[in-house]
């Protein structure tokens, strides 16, 4: 359903019939484009780099939204003792997908700047596979903290899709600059 307005626009502008092919994750999107199963894909920054490498530099970017120029992530938790990134040492933690720029790569970079190595400093590191799944993992207590794209967090919060009664809060928001 999310793709319908784009499909309608492309069909109107090109006169072509557009078929939407859903994929399960970022890696599947990369493989679909590289193996010419699809003609176009929507990627984040990190996934675009993966596709460019896998394709032998044959992937061409055609559009970028204004908000894609900057990446901001939020770190979330239900633990009231966690107030800074340094307080995350020793917790169970979830990133989103391993191929997510704002759900993995950028949060990992900001953790490193704060002197935190997830493999050494977290009790356990998980990958939820998606931004909303990270919220669900923190909300259910599967992990003590997690990181996700700020726009997804804002949308979930606005639409009341943050699990009720979990008291999930944001102790840290990353800068849009490294």
Show the residue positions of the predicted features:
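Ligand-binding "clamshell"
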Residues: 51-63, 156-171
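Generic structural signal for residues in well-ordered beta-strands
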Residues: 18-20, 125, 168-170
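Loop/turn elements at helix/coil->beta-strand transitions in domains of secreted/extracellular proteins
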Residues: 16, 37, 57-59, 90-91, ...
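Beta->alpha turn/N-cap motifs
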Residues: 22-26, 36-54, 147-156
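N-terminal, post-signal-peptide region of Sec/Tat-exported proteins
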Residues: 4-38
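Short beta-strand-centered segments that line the small-molecule binding cleft or hinge
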Residues: 39-41, 49-50, 58-72
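Bilobed "Venus flytrap"/periplasmic-binding protein-like clamshell domains
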Residues: 1-13, 23, 46, 70-136, ...
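Periplasmic-binding protein-like
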Residues: 66-74, 161-178
